[in-house]
């Protein structure tokens, strides 16, 4: 933008100067009519041209300053938007915002927080309905072999390769508080899965389906855990590049070797697609509650298998840590 302003400022004096030189140099009769001879008119022309050059230089300097100011403001704006995660808002604050205020801010991928409340589970014995359960991951680690040779497999930090669409939301189900203080939650409905891909330090990408389908968690509010269903990352109708699928496509796309020895197991993995589900485990902990508004927040940690590419690859363990928010009615 600064270059365009400078170009405009340079062109304007040039256009202004052109007719001035044309009129002053038109003919000697016009000079004599005003009482000037040719030499005086020439000096006058040079004087006007020098003034125009000064004006052009000032316009150029002003354009440079304007361009620098615009670039500085752009850097400030981009720096403000790149500072990191936005401020965490309460449920009411999020509901009060318009679509355009939320769009592109990162708020849609965040779980709400609680203002005030108590740092304990302050709900009495009884049966409730847990609604608007939100699970926001803050860390993805994958159990894999280290870069160093002979190093045992361990959970390694990863780089997120997908957009900020990994938060689960609007999950609901029955929630019960027993007389002995234990709680029980059963997941029934909601946006309970999200496809995520992360990258290991060595460059390997690990896709998985972050989910809590059919979760049944029991225990004390400080730590209640349970198992859940992890569906196949790909559906049975998905076709691989050779047209093979679980419920559609070719049965075999690679011919069996003569004699049927040596590669049977590898060929079976590629030809026969496995879309069976697996199991994950999650532990939730309550860190703060607000009974007057029915809100509760906490942290969670889950371990689940990654994608198997329809049975052709061994799954990796994925550890997901984050925060959660819910409302009890």
Swiss-Prot record:
This is Oxygen-evolving enhancer protein 1, chloroplastic. InterPro entries: OMP/PagP_b-brl, PsbO. Its main location: plastid. PANTHER family: OXYGEN-EVOLVING ENHANCER PROTEIN 1-2, CHLOROPLASTIC. Stabilizes the manganese cluster which is the primary site of water splitting. It is found in: Plastid, Chloroplast thylakoid membrane. SUPFAM superfamilies: OMPA-like. GO terms for cellular component: chloroplast thylakoid membrane; photosystem II oxygen evolving complex. Disulfide bonds: none annotated. The keyword Transit peptide applies. Keywords: Chloroplast, Manganese, Membrane, Photosynthesis, Photosystem II, Plastid, Thylakoid, Transit peptide. Signal peptide: none annotated. Residues 1-82 form a transit peptide. It comes from the Eukaryota. The lineage of its organism: Eukaryota, Viridiplantae, Streptophyta, Embryophyta, Tracheophyta. Belongs to the PsbO family. GO terms for biological process: photosystem II assembly; photosystem II stabilization. One of its GO terms (molecular function) is oxygen evolving activity.
């Amino acid at each position: 933008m600064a270059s365009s302003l400078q170009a405009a400022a340079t062109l304007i004096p040039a256009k202004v100067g052109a007719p001035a030189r044309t009129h002053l140099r038109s003919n000697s009769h016009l000079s004599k009519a005003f009482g000037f001879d040719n030499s005086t008119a020439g000096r006058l022309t040079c004087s006007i041209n020098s003034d125009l050059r000064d004006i052009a230089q000032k316009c150029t300097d002003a354009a440079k300053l304007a361009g620098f100011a615009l670039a500085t403001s752009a850097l400030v704006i981009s720096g403000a938007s790149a500072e990191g995660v936005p401020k965490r808002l309460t449920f009411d604050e999020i509901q009060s915002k318009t679509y355009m205020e939320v769009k592109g801010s990162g708020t849609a991928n965040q779980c709400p927080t609680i203002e005030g409340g108590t740092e304990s589970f302050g709900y009495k014995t009884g049966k409730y309905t847990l609604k608007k359960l939100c699970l926001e991951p803050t860390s993805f680690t994958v159990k894999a072999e280290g870069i160093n040779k002979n190093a045992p497999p361990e959970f390694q930090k990863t780089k997120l390769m997908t957009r900020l669409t990994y938060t689960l939301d609007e999950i609901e189900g029955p929630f019960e508080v027993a007389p002995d203080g234990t709680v029980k939650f059963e997941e029934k409905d909601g946006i309970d899965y999200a496809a995520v891909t992360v990258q290991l330090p060595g460059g390997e990408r690990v896709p998985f389906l972050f989910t809590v389908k059919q979760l049944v968690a029991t225990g004390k509010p400080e730590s209640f855990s349970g198992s859940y269903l992890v569906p196949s990352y790909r559906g049975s109708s998905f076709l691989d590049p050779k047209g093979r699928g679980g419920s559609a496509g070719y049965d075999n796309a690679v011919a069996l070797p003569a004699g049927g020895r040596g590669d049977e197991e590898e060929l079976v993995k590629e030809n026969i697609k496995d879309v069976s589900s697996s199991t994950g485990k999650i532990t939730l902990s309550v860190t703060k509650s607000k009974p007057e508004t029915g809100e509760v927040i906490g942290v969670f940690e889950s371990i689940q298998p990654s994608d198997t590419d329809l049975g052709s690859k061994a799954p990796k363990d994925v550890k997901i840590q984050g925060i959660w928010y819910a409302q009890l009615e």
